[in-house]
C-alpha cells in the first residue's frame, strides 16, 4: 500500500475513455427495458413470440458480438503499438467474417424458421404465437447483417478509444430512432405488434447510414 500512487493523468484518461462506454451500456439496457414495457401492452402470445424470436436470432448475433469484443482488444493493442495498418486489416477481416456469418446464417434460418419456432412453440396449441414468431423472425433476419456490422464498428470505436462514438451510435439507434418509432407506430398509426419490428428495421438502417457518414 505504501508504494500505491494515484496518477491523476491516467485516472482522467480512464474516465474519459471508460465513462462513455459505461453510459452506452446503461442506456442500451434501459432502452430495451422500455421497449419491453411497451411490448407488455400487447397480448401474451406477442410477448412469447418476440422472446422466442430473439433467442433464435441470438444464435447468429452472439457470434458477431463476440467478434466485435475481440476486435476491440486487437485494435487497442495495435494502435498502442503504432501498427495502424494492422489494426485496419483486423477491422476489415472482422467485418468480412461477420457479414459472412450473418448473411449465410440468415439465409439458412429464413428457410428453417418454422421448424426452429416449433421447438419452442406448438403450432397446434398456440397458432397465434407461432405465426407471429415466424413473421417476427423474418424481419429480425432481414436486418441481422446490419446488426452484425453495428457490433463490429462499436468494437472498433471502443478499441480505438473513441467511446463517445459508441455512445452516440447506441443513443441514435435506440433512443432517437427505435423507441420513438415504436411509440409512434403503436399510438398514432396504431398497427399493433408489427410496430416493434418495423421500428427495428428503421433504426438499424438509420444506424447503418450514420455509420457510413462517420466512416466517410
Briefly describe each language-model feature range.
Residues 1-18, 75-143, 186-214:
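Short alpha-helical transmembrane segments in multi-pass integral membrane proteins
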Residues 3-34, 59, 63, 67, ...:
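Hydrophobic faces of transmembrane alpha-helices in multi-pass small-molecule transporters and flippases
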Amino acid at each position: 500500500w505504501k508504494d500505491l500512487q494515484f496518477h491523476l493523468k491516467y485516472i482522467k484518461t480512464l474516465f474519459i475513455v471508460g465513462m462513455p462506454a459505461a453510459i452506452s451500456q446503461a442506456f442500451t439496457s434501459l432502452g430495451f427495458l422500455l421497449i419491453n414495457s411497451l411490448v407488455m401492452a400487447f397480448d401474451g402470445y406477442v410477448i412469447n413470440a418476440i422472446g422466442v424470436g430473439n433467442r433464435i436470432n441470438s444464435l447468429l448475433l452472439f457470434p458477431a458480438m463476440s467478434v466485435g469484443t475481440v476486435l476491440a482488444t486487437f485494435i487497442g493493442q495495435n494502435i498502442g503499438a503504432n501498427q495502424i495498418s494492422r489494426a485496419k486489416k483486423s477491422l476489415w477481416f472482422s467485418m468480412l467474417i461477420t457479414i459472412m456469418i450473418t448473411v449465410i446464417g440468415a439465409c439458412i434460418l429464413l428457410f428453417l424458421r418454422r421448424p426452429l419456432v416449433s421447438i419452442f412453440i406448438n403450432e397446434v396449441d398456440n397458432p397465434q404465437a407461432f405465426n407471429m414468431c415466424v413473421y417476427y423472425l423474418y424481419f429480425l433476419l432481414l436486418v441481422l447483417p446490419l446488426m452484425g456490422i453495428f457490433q463490429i464498428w462499436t468494437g472498433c470505436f471502443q478499441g480505438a478509444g473513441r467511446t463517445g462514438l459508441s455512445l452516440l451510435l447506441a443513443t441514435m439507434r435506440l433512443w432517437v430512432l427505435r423507441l420513438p418509432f415504436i411509440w409512434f407506430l403503436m399510438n398514432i398509426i396504431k398497427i399493433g405488434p408489427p410496430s416493434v419490428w418495423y421500428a427495428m428495421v428503421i433504426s438499424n438502417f438509420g444506424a447503418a447510414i450514420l455509420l457510413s457518414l462517420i466512416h466517410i
